[in-house]
Amino acid sequence: MALVTQARTLGKYFLLLDNMLVVLGFFVVFPLISIRFVEQLGWAGVIVGFALGLRQLVQQGLGIFGGAIADRFGAKPMIITGMLLRALGFALMALADKPWILWLSCILSALGGTLFDPPRTALVIKLTRPYERGRFYSLLLMQDSAGAVIGALIGSWLLLYDFHLVCWVGAGIFVLAAIFNAWLLPAYRISTTRTPIKEGLKRVILDKRFVQYVLTLTGYFVLSVQVMLMFPIVVNEIAGTPSAVKWMYAIEALLSLTLLYPIARWSEKHFRLEQRLMAGLFLMSISMFPVGITHSLHAIFLIITLFYLGTITAEPARETLSASLADPRARGSYMGFSRLGLAFGGAIGYTGGGWMYDIGKQLELPELPWFLLGSIGFITLYALHRQFNRKKIETAMLTP
């Protein structure tokens, strides 16, 4: 028993270090894509939004297949291959001088994420006990925030010299992460049985409760992905310099490092998971409406603070709820399918956000995209409320 506990502990330390590399490599590049191609090169927002949405749709939409393959063959080969594919995508992005090259680089990056993301998420479930899972997700999210601000700082600094450097550094970090996994990650199996690919896919698709929950979250992700597209654009417009974007991620890091874990610990004692998810979504939705009429950098940072408070309230609950509902016989398949809401939400949020940004500029109605985003948030909130109240999920499944 002591050996099992030691293995779990070492595994969790490995996950934390691995997660830092993945987050750092991602945020060196992706927050700066909209600034590089929209603000610096003058491309239409819908072109860049389509690229980001395509990456989201491919990665998360195909995640169920990546998870099912990992159920069959184990986590390690999928993770290593996926990280090398993402590195290749970032290297190609450095050469993007036409939209199709940017789109292709995003597809390669997405296919990499399709392979490594579901098994990494399933490893979290495998290596954590149910009662500690919510807190471990909180630690990962705190780390995500720290990695985001460090990555954005590095990327913003490199962008002052050359966007090629931004992409090459991001690619190098993912190559390093692949080597790290090849060297240290044991050949874990992520499910309790060696589930055939077809059986794992069938098991999750027939779970109507889980499918409905995942698809309802599409609207949640339409809002959450705006930290990669619309928020950086509006901060850059108000500040007049792309270097201001790093302060947006600094706010997220500060809030996460100081409040995320205490909020998670306090709220898990007083509220159910679905209540925490809906409270966070409410804050995210209400923060959208004033963005388009704000012209002060301090005011926009206050609004972003409110948005991030919603995110750090909702995210640990959302992740824990998804894990609670997963069948342990097909963890990879379930965790892959759980990304489908992010796939649809990302595709709609990025492409639709870029299109609404262009339309708002043409009509001289900068508040239009933000009003529509806020409305989507409240529609999603209503849908979640109906879902949780029409058919209660078992209490045991809703407690971390």
Curated annotation (Swiss-Prot):
One Pfam family this sequence matches: MFS_1
GO cellular component: plasma membrane
Domain of life of the source: Bacteria
SUPFAM superfamilies recorded: MFS general substrate transporter
Record field: transmembrane: 13-33, 34-54, 99-116, 139-159, 165-185, 214-234, 244-264, 289-309, 340-360, 365-385
MF-aspect GO terms: transmembrane transporter activity
InterPro entries associated with the record: MFS (IPR011701), MFS_dom (IPR020846), MFS_trans_sf (IPR036259), MFS_Transporters (IPR050171), Multidrug-R_MdtH (IPR022855)
Cell compartments where the protein resides: Cell inner membrane
Membrane topology: Multi-pass membrane protein
CDD domains tied to this protein: MFS_MdtH_MDR_like
Keyword field: Cell inner membrane, Cell membrane, Membrane, Transmembrane, Transmembrane helix, Transport
Chief subcellular location: membrane
PANTHER family tied to this protein: MULTIDRUG RESISTANCE PROTEIN MDTH (PTHR23517:SF2), RESISTANCE PROTEIN MDTM, PUTATIVE-RELATED-RELATED (PTHR23517)
Family label: Belongs to the major facilitator superfamily. DHA1 family. MdtH (TC 2.A.1.2.21) subfamily.
The protein, known as: Multidrug resistance protein MdtH
Organism: Proteus mirabilis (strain HI4320)
